[in-house]
Amino acid sequence: MAFLDGIIYDSIYHAVPILLCVLGGIFAYKANVLNIALEGMMLAGSFFSVLISFQTGNIVLGYLAAIGACLVIGLIFAFFGVSCKGNVIIIGLAINMSVTAIAGFVLQLMNSANIRLNFTNAADFKINIPMIENIPILGSILSGHTVITYVSFVLIVLIWFLMYRTKFGIYVRVVGENE
């Protein structure tokens, strides 16, 4: 049973970055925009998060850098897709390939300059919730995750509420159904 608990725990732990990407992509999907650049946003966010966290030693600044990088990539995608009326598939693929190439190039420059990124241990940031930890089966699965994991679970409910219970959500869905 501990083996199965470990698999489910790791699945939840590793699904969080993809879940956050999907939660952001829901807005584009509901507005009838096919955002192929989500992979590039994830890569830019993770690259700048690690880079800024390493440079400053502050993981919160790393999270903010990831958000900022994703916002910039999203603005580039929106500019070329909406303002310039470009093909969103081609723009998304171009962004994905460009971000991949730029991140690889910068990492090669850092390696040639003997700049090594030290990674922090994610186990240092895990939170054990006493109420959940003592539940026989669910305790080992749901307790001991990082803050961002619990935030992503809350974001699922908040985004559902925003999309289906607010005027903003109605506007986004109406624009997606009838441009």
Name these PLM-found stretches:
Residues 1-8, 128, 134:
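Short, strongly hydrophobic alpha-helical membrane anchors
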Residues 6-55, 63-64, 68-89:
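Single transmembrane alpha-helix segments in multi-pass membrane proteins
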Residues 26-33, 58, 82, 86, ...:
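Transmembrane helix-loop junctions in multipass membrane proteins, especially transporters and channels
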Residues 45-47, 94-103:
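Small-residue-rich segments of transmembrane alpha-helices in multi-pass membrane proteins
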Residues 57-65, 87-91, 95, 147-151:
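Membrane-interface starts of transmembrane alpha-helices
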Residues 69, 95-99, 155:
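Transmembrane alpha-helical core residues of multi-pass small-molecule transporters
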Residues 100-164:
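Transmembrane helix-bundle core of multi-pass membrane transporters
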Residues 158-179:
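Membrane-helix/interface signature in polytopic inner-membrane proteins
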